């Protein structure tokens, strides 16, 4: 094999590592993995909040003039669509592409009933988002309106449901991942709020 062919083979094998891992059948009830990935997701969303805060403080006077509660809400309207885009991408991959050979969750029972790592990532990515968002809304914003209580309930019920789904570990994991596709409308709602806030 020539050196070019060897380099190409090496590049191909290393470029597909993520896809190979995502499509691998996940082990049943790997609680330590769930904990590690949950902590990683929480750290990611906390870091994202920090980055948005630092950038917004430097780039927009509207954000600088807000009090801490409004800044938290402002960041939530940026973090939320970032989470939603990630959730929709993972959900789409899980529905249509991860099983390979033209198999989808809609035309193949094995694809629908086999929990893969991509399903776990999608669920725990969302749990990490809900945990961080709940923390900021409850402890920083301290909202006490009907909508705030509805949001608290939504976050607690969704997080609990996704962790229970992982505990029971069956087709519900796949179904939970599919349901994340409904996040597709989220960026538009958040964009509307941001445009209104900036007077556009």
Tell me what each language-model feature is.
Residues 2-181, 186-189, 193-200:
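Membrane-helix and juxtamembrane interface regions of eukaryotic multi-pass membrane proteins
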């Amino acid at each position: 094999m020539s050196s070019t062919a060897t380099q190409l083979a090496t590049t191909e094998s290393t470029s597909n590592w993520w896809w190979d891992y995502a499509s691998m059948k996940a082990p049943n009830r790997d609680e330590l993995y769930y904990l590690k990935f949950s902590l990683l997701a929480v750290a990611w969303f906390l870091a994202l909040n920090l980055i948005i805060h630092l950038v917004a403080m430097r780039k927009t006077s509207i954000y600088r003039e807000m009090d801490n509660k409004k800044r938290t809400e402002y960041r939530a309207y940026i973090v939320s669509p970032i989470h939603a885009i990630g959730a929709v991408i993972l959900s789409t991959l899980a529905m249509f592409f991860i099983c390979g050979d033209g198999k989808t969750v809609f035309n193949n029972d094995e694809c629908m009933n086999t929990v893969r790592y991509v399903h776990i990532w999608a669920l725990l990515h969302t749990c990490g988002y809900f945990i961080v968002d709940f923390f900021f809304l409850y402890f920083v914003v301290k909202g006490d309106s009907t909508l705030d209580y509805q949001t608290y309930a939504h976050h607690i019920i969704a997080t609990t449901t996704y962790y229970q789904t992982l505990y029971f570990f069956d087709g519900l994991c796949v179904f939970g991942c599919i349901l994340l596709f409904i996040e597709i409308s989220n960026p538009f709602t958040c964009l509307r709020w941001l445009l209104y806030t900036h007077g556009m």
